[in-house]
Each structure stands twice: as structure tokens, then as C-alpha cells.
Amino acid sequence: VPPVYADLGKGARDLFSKGYNYGFSKL
């Protein structure tokens, strides 16, 4: 796996986690 792809995946996971937690806290 290319480092750039792995870094992109990590960023996407972090972003998704933040977005999910934010949306969940609003419920």
C-alpha cells in the first residue's frame, strides 16, 4: 500500500469519526 494512500485513508477515517461523533451528539 502506497504511503500516500494509507495517509489518505487515515485522514478519511479521522474525518468520518469526527463527523459521526458530531452527528451522534446532536441526536
From Swiss-Prot:
Chief localization: mitochondrion
Tissue-specific expression: Photoreceptors.
Localization of this protein: Mitochondrion outer membrane
GO cellular component, one term: pore complex
Keywords per UniProt: Ion transport, Membrane, Mitochondrion, Mitochondrion outer membrane, Porin, Transmembrane, Transmembrane beta strand, Transport
Gene Ontology MF terms: porin activity
Gene Ontology BP annotations: monoatomic ion transport
Domain comment (free text): Consists mainly of membrane-spanning sided beta-sheets.
UniProt family annotation: Belongs to the eukaryotic mitochondrial porin family.
Protein task: Forms a channel through the cell membrane that allows diffusion of small hydrophilic molecules.
Subunit structure and binding partners: Interacts with hexokinases.
Protein name in the entry: Voltage-dependent anion-selective channel protein
Organism: Doryteuthis pealeii (Longfin inshore squid)
